[in-house]
């Protein structure tokens, strides 16, 4: 119930303001471990680094999602990208890129199923979901799918020795298909960065107008 209330509050705030996203923080625990990478993650998060940057990414993500699905759902998915990466080494845009690459061409549909059996917006394989504590049916729930996807990307990050770009490619797999996946992901990242730049420019204009008044 608490998680649902936090998510509802986040969606409301995103809908009310596209250039300002003040969201209640909700911790998503990083998988247990005591590697150097784990310790570095904890040090970074304890300093509260990147919270403002995280917030700045949300409007751009919502706009990009809204090109593929209805605005209300776009806001909800953008909220999940923010909330489910708190307390992890990932940024909202990392999960947004994966969602767009996996199901952006299918309306970011929660019931998407690949020919290999991957499910949900983030296309997690059921066998992998089970290792993170989720069932195949859970993956058709956007919130649970996002949680499973974050944990799956984290496992790939460990495999990639902390190389996030490589981890994202491993999220798809290996070989030519993974190469094509990586090319698409970079295109979606470019789209998101362009939207972030546009919002930043709009913010600068508003600030200049406010100073002139």
Could you tell me what each predicted segment is?
Residues 4-13:
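Sec-dependent N-terminal signal peptides
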Residues 18, 22, 28-31, 38-213:
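Catalytic glycan-binding domains that act on GlcNAc-containing polysaccharides
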